[in-house]
Amino acid sequence: MSQIADKDVAEKPDADDSHKNKGLYAAILGSIGVVYGDIGTSPLYAFREALKPIAYDGVTREEVIGLTSLMIWSLTIIVTFKYITLLLRADNDGEGGTLSLLALLMKTAGTHRSVLIVLGLIGAALFLGDAMITPALSVLSAVEGLKLVTPAMDDFIIPISVCILIGLFAIQSHGTGTVAKFFGPITAVWFLVMGGAGLIHIADDFGILFAFNPWHAVEFLANEGFYGVVVLGAVFLTITGAEALYADLGHFGRRPIQWAWFCLVFPALTLNYLGQGALVLKDPAAMSNPFYLMFPQWAILPAVILATAATIIASQAVITGAFSLVRQAIHLGYLPRMEILFTSETNTGQIYLPAVNTILLFGVVALVLTFKSSDALATAYGISVTGAMVVTSLMFFEFVRKRWQWSIWLALAVLTPLLLLELIFLGANLLKIHDGGYVPVLLAIAFTVIMTTWQRGSRILFAKTRRGDVPLKAFVASVEKESAHAPVRVPGTAIFLTGDPEAAPAALLHNLKHNHVLHDKNVILTIRTEDQPRVRPEDRYTLTKLSDRFAVVELHFGFMETQNVTQALGYLRRTGYKFDIMSTSFYLGRRKLVPDPKSGMPGWQNRLFIALAETAADPSDYFRLPANRVVELGSHVVV
């Protein structure tokens, strides 16, 4: 739309502006439902949890105002300044997120490449851990409001929560396109209700407005000492979900996300925290559940229903984000191939990964059954999010130096205060390690080990198989020679998939050795994943002819694209390289991996790599190859 010619704008200014505005409004509403679902449910538990460390001897007026000030200024500094103002501009062709930023930095990584990869994988692992904790905590905190409707519901909180979560994961395979259009409006109503409730209760004590003065936050931390640091771990709950702003950049774009934040989300959150603070100033007994106690008795049940809907939407956003992140990791070579199903005929972003969905479901239900309440689960929350934020800040420092050409002094001046603040938050959350905080740490370690093992093992496997490779050009020259031992020529086209276009594929060598035939046309096909989200159609392939019978083709995909080989080969046919897809055979090499104590990895890591390789999705399904045209030839490889 930005490239419309001036004369076109002059001819139809009203229609054009109307079309652009409608698109912007739709994107703003969509971002409210997807991007801000997580941070929008934080008021359910954040203020309550932050009060607990200082409530052992009652809370003073100064403590409540100082605590509220901490929350408002955390939202202002971390979310508004770091994410909304700075990070949303650090896009990789419109895409955001940890792995997208990592892919962008790889282009200019230099000697820091390995450090950046480790940082990126840790950040991705922390997000996946967060994807387990967020649905459990959000749904539990919403359903617990039923206890205020009637105490008789107390015994049903966990069963209801588990049923909601099982239902949420069960519908993933059917897609969320039909209900997703309601996510934005429902979440917008949620923010309006939250903001309205907070605005009404500010009148309980207008003194809460002093919280806008950051000095009260500083004074609170200075006076509370150790307990102030503990409180910071709970205050951080107000900004959980901030990483989603960056991760979902590609879905909605920078402007809609920024408009939604400044026009609705930030004001609603600020008003709600002010309202909870004013309510506690008026009635300290409201500390038990200040969010729901802002509503009159008749409105608590409707508020619980709306909150439950909002938490389901927030959980859906995290699940979708996990699917998207894992797909990126697969395409970038950090995870083995997994089955990826598309739940929409029009939106390629709506995907479903059965393996990831199952892992998340069992993890989320286990967390609910283990911790049993949002109070207990909130202690486990925060470490994964703060860790992910610290990782993002470190990577962003490298980004502004290399991509934006900031001087070292400007980068330090802007980002050091942010990093120090996030490190303080991380330290405060680490105090909860013994009280459930070990859960996100263990999850992050597990996911990081899996990704680093797969990347390292794949590199070792590639190096070992290459040692015995036959150079492709030498192979072609030898088989093209006329001799009594020349292989039999058969009609049709054979396409051999390989990771190294400079070597003769193992499947080609095995076919020649055992069947003694060569096709009229032989295509050596390599699939490349680029460090950008999408590749233009004209850049989809490169074709190099080695002889009349042999050609090397490289197909290029972005890390956000579906690697549909059959469809991509259609571009090749249009250029004049003709072949009949129905008389074409796709040859794949299937390796049986055998552990080698001298592989370069510890024995346990070697066994883990082999186990991961055995779970990898069938390449014919993953690359969308016609099942009845695929031939697999096996071999043993020692790794």
Curated annotation (Swiss-Prot):
Membrane topology qualifier: Multi-pass membrane protein
Reaction equation(s) it catalyzes: K(+)(in) + H(+)(in) = K(+)(out) + H(+)(out)
Pfam families (UniProt xref): K_trans, K_trans_C
UniProt organism field: Agrobacterium fabrum (strain C58 / ATCC 33970)
HAMAP family: Kup
Gene: kup1
Subcellular location, principal: membrane
Keywords tagged on the record: Cell inner membrane, Cell membrane, Ion transport, Membrane, Potassium, Potassium transport, Symport, Transmembrane, Transmembrane helix, Transport
Protein name stated in the entry: Probable potassium transport system protein Kup 1
Protein family per UniProt: Belongs to the HAK/KUP transporter (TC 2.A.72) family.
InterPro entries, per the entry: K+_transporter, K_trans_C, K_trans_N, Kup
Compartments (UniProt record): Cell inner membrane
